[in-house]
Each structure stands twice: as structure tokens, then as C-alpha cells.
Swiss-Prot record:
One of its GO terms (molecular function) is enzyme regulator activity. Gene3D superfamilies: 3.30.70.120. P-II indirectly controls the transcription of the glutamine synthetase gene (GlnA). P-II prevents NR-II-catalyzed conversion of NR-I to NR-I-phosphate, the transcriptional activator of GlnA. When P-II is uridylylated to P-II-UMP, these events are reversed. When the ratio of Gln to 2-ketoglutarate decreases, P-II is uridylylated to P-II-UMP, which causes the deadenylation of glutamine synthetase by GlnE, so activating the enzyme. The lineage of its organism: Bacteria, Pseudomonadati, Pseudomonadota, Gammaproteobacteria, Pasteurellales. The modification O-UMP-tyrosine is found at residue 51. SUPFAM superfamilies: GlnB-like. Homotrimer. The keyword Transmembrane helix does not apply. GO terms for cellular component: cytosol. Belongs to the P(II) protein family. Keywords: Nucleotide-binding, Phosphoprotein, Transcription, Transcription regulation. Uridylylated/deuridylylated by GlnD. This is Nitrogen regulatory protein P-II.
């Protein structure tokens, strides 16, 4: 099993969720986050003064999937979240050693 963590633009969330649902991924965790990458934010003009906006709003999407769905999941996120502009986000993939559903005690792929 792998945990896929994607930082995406907030307005892309519904499209990404639908795309993942289309390939059979129904469970996910979403967190509103703020961050920046290489571009280190941008400047904005407010009441005649220029301000540096360091941390931009993003959505962190987390899913745990069987190994055989990893590539398909990554492709779905990229195809749906990509705008071609700076700040599209990042995807990280982690190994998950064990998963347990608290309510039933099911483990690993049965738990996801």
C-alpha cells in the first residue's frame, strides 16, 4: 500500500475528487494548508502599499491505495490538477506498512 499526498490548488479539488472516484478511489482526507515552493509567493497591492504574500492557499489531499492503483491515481491527479502555471502543486508517495480500520479491526487493503 502507498499513501499519496498531493498539494493542489483549491479550485481543482472537486475535479480531482471526481477523477479519483472514477478510478474507484472513494476515501480521502482533505486539509486546507498554506505554503510556497520555488517561486516563494508573490506581491499584492493593498491600499496603495505592496505586500509580500509568502504562503499561498493550497489543499492537501491524502489517499491510501493498493500498490496496483498508485500510477493510475498519480496520473488522475496530474491530468486533473495541472494548469500549466506556477503553483500547480506537488505529489508525494509514501510506503504504508499497515492500515487498521478502528471500528471493525480490518487490516491493510481491507481497511482502506
Amino acid at each position: 500500500m502507498k499513501k499519496i499526498e498531493a498539494m493542489i490548488k483549491p479550485f481543482k479539488l472537486d475535479d480531482v475528487r471526481e477523477s479519483l472516484s472514477d478510478i474507484g478511489i472513494s476515501g480521502m482526507t482533505i486539509t486546507e494548508v498554506r505554503g510556497f515552493g520555488r517561486q516563494k509567493g508573490h506581491t499584492e497591492l493593498y491600499r496603495g502599499a505592496e505586500y509580500m504574500v509568502d504562503f499561498l492557499p493550497k489543499v492537501k489531499l491524502e489517499v491510501v491505495v493498493p500498490d496496483e492503483l498508485v500510477d493510475q491515481c498519480i496520473e488522475a491527479i496530474i491530468e486533473t490538477a495541472q494548469t500549466g502555471k506556477i503553483g500547480d502543486g506537488k505529489i508525494f508517495v509514501y510506503h504504508v506498512e499497515r492500515a487498521i480500520r478502528i471500528r471493525t479491526g480490518e487490516e491493510n487493503e481491507d481497511a482502506i
